[in-house]
Amino acid sequence: MNANEDERLEYFRTLLAERFELAPEDLRPDARLYEDLDLDSIDALDLAIVIREVTGRKIDPQAFHQVRTVGDVEREVRRLLVNL
Amino acid sequence: MILTLGNRLDSLRRSTLAGLCSIGFGAVALFGVCVLLPGLLLITPPSRRARRVRGLASVGFRILIRMIEGCGLAKIELEGTETLDTEGCLLVANHPSYLDAVFLMAYFPHVNCVMKPALLNHPLFFPFTRLGGYIAGSEQNPLKLVESCRVAAARGDTILIFPEGTRTTPGKPLHFRRGTAQIALRAELPIVPVVISCDPPALTHGRPWYRMPSRRVRLVIRFHTARAITDFAEESPSALPRMARQVTRGLESYFVEHLASSTRETTHLS
């Protein structure tokens, strides 16, 4: 992970907090998107859009389906950033 | 309210009447499904079918309302109907009782609504719920739901929606889910707030027909002026997920405020 990737990840967290009205402290790695952070099925679509905005790439639907926690999403974002 | 013997007998009498109305409506629905609906389908061209089916359903609901009002179970009062134009709008209503949905389906002859899967598969009503061109409720494909609403509104349908997603639980605060806001924002539909009060509570969540109250139910339905959903936002336009959250809160506060003032009015009258 280089500095640019760290920056992008930080930007991702900022967008997440802003778009879904979350406090930075809510974004713990084990925080569950649906149960803890109150995201619903339509938010999931917007989340995919945020991922695209930050990484410039679309997340694989299969991978996205497995995502449950903030940690899961960040891992996917990292993966997409690294493969650039 | 003290539960005197008189009250209990009244309650029992009203519950019996409610039961009879349910059976009566069941018979009407059965006749509708077996005789009237096939007849209607035979003489209606496909393009007009869905609308006519909804019109027929509305007749059934009107009969039910007549029965309910006729035997003194409920009295329904309307306000704000003078300049009411709901074409292409979302009718956004709170949902204290079964009666409010029944009444709104009766009052607006071709009203559309989001049909729950349970109703699409209902053993008695499914011919109506499936042929009426109602919007299919779908958790799996929310954007399709939004698009269906957009299309329906574009052809002039009035779309009834309950932000709570179910009947209000008495004693618990109003809780609006975000679906209504998402639909209104993404399909860009004006909304008509419909504030409904039901006193005393009847046919609420957890109160079936055999637990009717001991006095006549007064259902007051107030139509407010149509407005943009963004009117309920706290800040100027921002990203959709954020807007949906703000607007849902704004909508909820609006209803809480207006329900509180209507309760105050009722208390003063009685």
What are these regions (language model features)?
Chain A
Residues 18-38, 55-63:
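Phosphopantetheine carrier-protein modules
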Residues 65-83:
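C-terminal structural segments of small proteins and small subunits
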Residues 1-25, 78-84:
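Thiotemplate assembly-line natural product biosynthesis machinery
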Residues 44-66:
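Phosphopantetheinylated carrier protein domains
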Residues 13, 30, 48:
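Generic structural marker for isolated residues within well-ordered, non-membrane alpha-helices
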